[in-house]
Design a protein with these regions (language model features):
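Beta-propeller folds
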Residues: 1-167
Length: 167
């Protein structure tokens, strides 16, 4: 049959607008009218990324809009966090965690990134813990329960970090 429901992936809110990503284009949808407006294309973004030697996006489904008051989006390419201004078409900032990083947690309020390497926790380039084997920091403990699926928790301003420590 040719009749089927349209699958929409990656819908998210940016302030009062709904953002609908696709492979090649991001659209903004006005909730009251349903009017779609093109925000930016993957080709436009990739041109700027290539100029900055930051890699290329293969699709726009994983792009996030964590700032309701800024025309900026967040995405990762090859483990590198990239903040991109889609009004000015420019890379705002980039950060690549150290090799071996897992459990990355980007804080939109401060731009800090918490991550783990083996059993230790890092923020940006700095080691926060230096625990011996058998003591784990910054990762989920045992199993994901009560809607908790990570081991780090940023404060609202992004200047403090709470984390799980299991011995």
């Amino acid at each position: 049959s040719y009749l089927y429901a349209e699958n929409l992936y990656g819908l998210q809110w940016w302030g009062d607008e709904c953002i609908k990503p696709g492979v090649d284009t991001l659209y903004s949808i006005q909730p009251k009218t349903g009017k779609e407006t093109m925000v930016i294309t993957r080709e436009q973004i990739n041109k700027v990324l290539e100029e900055n030697k930051a890699g290329k996006l293969s699709h726009l489904y994983s792009v996030r809009f964590p700032w309701t008051d800024k025309a900026q989006m967040l995405f990762t390419i090859a483990g590198k966090f990239i903040v991109y201004n889609f009004k000015n078409n420019q890379v705002v900032s980039t950060f690549k965690p150290k090799d071996g990083a897992n459990n990355e947690d980007y804080c939109a309020a401060s731009g800090n990134v918490a991550y783990t390497i083996d059993n230790n926790l890092y923020v940006n380039e700095k080691a926060v813990t230096n625990e011996p084997e058998g003591i784990v920091c910054g990762q989920t403990v045992h199993r994901n329960e009560f809607g908790i699926n990570k081991g780090t928790f940023w404060s609202p301003k992004g200047n403090l970090l709470a984390f799980y420590r299991m011995d």
